[in-house]
Amino acid sequence: MGRIERAILNLIENEGDVHGAEDLAIEIYNSFPPTRAQTGSVLRAAHALARKQPDKIAEISGKGRDSFWIGAPHEIALYRRWVC
């Protein structure tokens, strides 16, 4: 796993909340607002992490940067019920 993937996994395991791509980029890179490149790299790493560890990480994704959410599977299930 890469540095960004480890940071995402650490945030999700410790905070246990649902995060968006820009929220993760702010936490990982410590910059506000994050650049498009930072948000894109976090988005790619989050997709890769969700594919590698489906038992620990779940995602909701749609079109665009703002519709991506990642978190623990039980948190995503709660978030999906709340949104839909």
State where each predicted segment sits.
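Short helix-capping/hinge SLiMs at alpha-helix to coil transitions
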Residues: 13-18, 31-32
